[in-house]
């Protein structure tokens, strides 16, 4: 696996879950002897929704909600075979979306 790189992108609504998952990935990769760059925090996407409270009139009565999507990026620069096996066996939290690309 010489001259290869594994790029891992993580997305989650809860920043504690994503930080815990990135810490597990970094610790697993370092334990198997790979070189790690990151975790790099990417911009947080904020979606805001405004909803009318009243069913009929009172346009001034509104509630505002927000969903934040936190993102992190981890690069594993020199992965070994043990690194790939350990990452495949890693069990992460259910609220974290993981995208892995080889480059």
UniProtKB/Swiss-Prot annotation:
Keywords attached to this entry: Ribonucleoprotein, Ribosomal protein
Recorded GO MF terms: structural constituent of ribosome; tRNA binding
Gene Ontology annotations of biological process type: translation
Keyword Transmembrane appears in the UniProt entry: no
Record carries keyword Ribosomal protein: yes
GO cellular component: ribonucleoprotein complex; ribosome
Quaternary structure and partners: Part of the 30S ribosomal subunit.
Annotated function: Involved in the binding of tRNA to the ribosomes.
Family: Belongs to the universal ribosomal protein uS10 family.
Name used for this protein in its record: Small ribosomal subunit protein uS10
